[in-house]
Amino acid sequence: FLDHMLESFSKHSLIDLEIKCVGDTHIDDHHSVEDVGIVLGSLLNQAIYPAKGIERFGSANIVMDEACVECDLDLSNRPFLYHSLSVSGKVGQFDTELVEEFFRAFILNAGISAHIVQKRGSNKHHIIEAAFKSVAVAIRRATVKNDRIGIPSTKDVL
């Protein structure tokens, strides 16, 4: 399931991904999911900052059938995550509690301030996929090149 979410993230963020994760999945998927988030976030951080010539802010509302999830983010290099995804149990063999673990690891290591808000939805798969897509599209919009901006901060540093 995480592979499917990462493929969706890659497609909608326009960030090419090739990930191979070998972990202690004989215990559970927690460490592997968290580690993928840490590495992906760290690499995005290296690619973005000092964030010169990009928009910096991004938002996206993504609808997937009955589910609607909004992501608003700031490439501020001041990490913060708020989320209100209402999912529990499993999607297939994937523990839905790991969605928060992934986003927390990814967002904090990327240096992003993000609010991921479920506006509606009842199908866990749809809610989670809409969340991944909303983060992806918001990142794509925040990283649009704009050479007129310079460093997108009045402090001239991020």
Task: Put a short name on every predicted segment.
Residues 1-158:
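N-terminal intrinsically disordered, cationic/polar leader segments
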